[in-house]
């Protein structure tokens, strides 16, 4: 599991506990008013800069923590809820959510970008906890635990600390002397000793993992045509229990395939090729159903940012060629190539993959053709040499005479 340095760790917010106690949601003003009985934290879903925000869900629970005598921390009283009145909250991301780029965001948000500017973005959702029904008996520090439920889905890497520790600092009101909330601090880990490193955060970091799938066409042999189009069908096969995008979720498609052609192919009509190839994105529904595409030698199709762990099948319509399939990532245990069926299959896409379909068409040139051409050619050559010899001899005789 990768481990990154928090992009906002060096920011001043992490040097000041009170500021860290008030997370900043995307687009929020630094001076915004916050209800002292409420605590807001963020959910950051990091992904490739070209990926569409997936419709993936995450679930959180708020519960009283345990007392830490060494730090004078008390267990939080019951009653803390999310603003919908429940102790468990599920959120679902969508393409309409706020997105911040890794080279232009409020660094007070502790987003776990990889540090390479321009290649990542994060969708941001805010969650709010309500302490208005909590009875804090005395001034002090009260601890709660925020926990994120995790799964084994390959498409999502969860926060390395699925439990965060929320300390609520309670003081006495200057007028009534009643206990009131002064501030709140969210800790990355459970701090139980005064000497431990204390990292303050503004929320949870998860990563949406994606990979590119590409396939390309090549031909070989002395009878192979480099201008001929070959028909392919690419189909996505989701694994049981794995993350599955919405049918309308779209994937960017790049590469070098002809989106339109001007004339009929030897096998396929211009209308057929143009109807199949004229696209720059494909929806999840199209890929589940299977999408036809036509490629000729030297062309490649790339489907970008498929969710990691998803399966696929690419099949080439067989013709009077001998197909051979090769993949550039041989470590992928789920990949199989059936040359007889001209089909490449993978039960789980786990890295960027390029599959090469090579069709061979060759054969021996008939020897009778060679003999028929070679005999007259040899006779012509003999005649030519004879003429040259006679001319040279005559010239020599004339010179001597």
Where do the protein language model's features map onto the residues?
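Solvent-exposed loop/turn and edge beta-strand elements of beta-rich ligand-binding domains
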Residues: 2-401
């Amino acid at each position: 599991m990768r481990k990154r340095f928090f992009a906002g760790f060096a920011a001043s917010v992490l040097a000041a506990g009170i500021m860290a106690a008030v997370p900043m949601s995307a687009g929020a003003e630094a001076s915004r008013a916050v209800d002292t009985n409420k605590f807001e934290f963020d959910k950051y879903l990091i992904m490739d800069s070209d990926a569409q925000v997936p419709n993936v869900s995450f679930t959180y629970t708020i519960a009283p923590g345990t007392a830490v005598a060494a730090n004078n921390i008390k267990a939080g009283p019951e009653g803390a809820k999310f603003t919908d009145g429940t102790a468990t909250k599920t959120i679902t991301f969508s393409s309409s959510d706020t997105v911040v780029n890794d080279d232009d965001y409020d660094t007070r948000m502790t987003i776990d970008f990889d540090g390479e500017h321009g290649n990542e973005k994060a969708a941001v959702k805010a969650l709010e906890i309500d302490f208005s029904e909590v009875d804090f008996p005395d001034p002090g520090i009260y601890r709660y635990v925020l926990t994120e439920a995790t799964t084994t889905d390959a498409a999502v890497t969860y926060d390395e600390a699925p439990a965060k520790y929320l300390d609520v600092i309670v003081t006495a009101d200057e007028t009534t002397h009643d206990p009131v909330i002064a501030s709140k601090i969210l800790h990355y880990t459970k701090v139980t000793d005064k000497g431990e490193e204390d990292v303050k955060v503004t929320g949870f970091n998860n990563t949406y993992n994606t990979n590119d799938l590409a396939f390309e066409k090549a031909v070989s042999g002395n009878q192979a045509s480099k201008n001929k189009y070959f028909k392919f069908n690419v189909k996505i096969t989701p694994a049981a229990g794995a993350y599955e995008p919405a049918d309308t979720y779209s994937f960017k498609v790049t590469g070098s395939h002809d989106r339109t052609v001007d004339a009929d192919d030897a096998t396929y009509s211009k209308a057929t090729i143009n109807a199949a190839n004229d696209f720059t994105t494909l929806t999840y529904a199209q890929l589940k159903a299977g999408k036809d595409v036509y490629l000729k030698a030297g062309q490649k199709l790339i489907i970008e940012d498929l969710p990691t762990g998803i399966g696929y099948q690419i099949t080439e319509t067989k013709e009077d060629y001998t197909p051979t399939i090769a993949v550039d990532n041989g470590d992928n245990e789920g990949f199989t190539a059936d040359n007889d069926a001209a089909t490449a299959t993978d039960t789980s896409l786990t890295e960027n993959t390029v599959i090469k379909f090579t069709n061979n068409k060759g054969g021996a040139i008939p020897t009778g053709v060679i003999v028929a051409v070679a005999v007259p050619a040899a006779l012509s050559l003999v005649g030519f040499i004879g003429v040259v010899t006679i001319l040279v001899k005559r010239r020599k005789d004339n010179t001597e005479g």
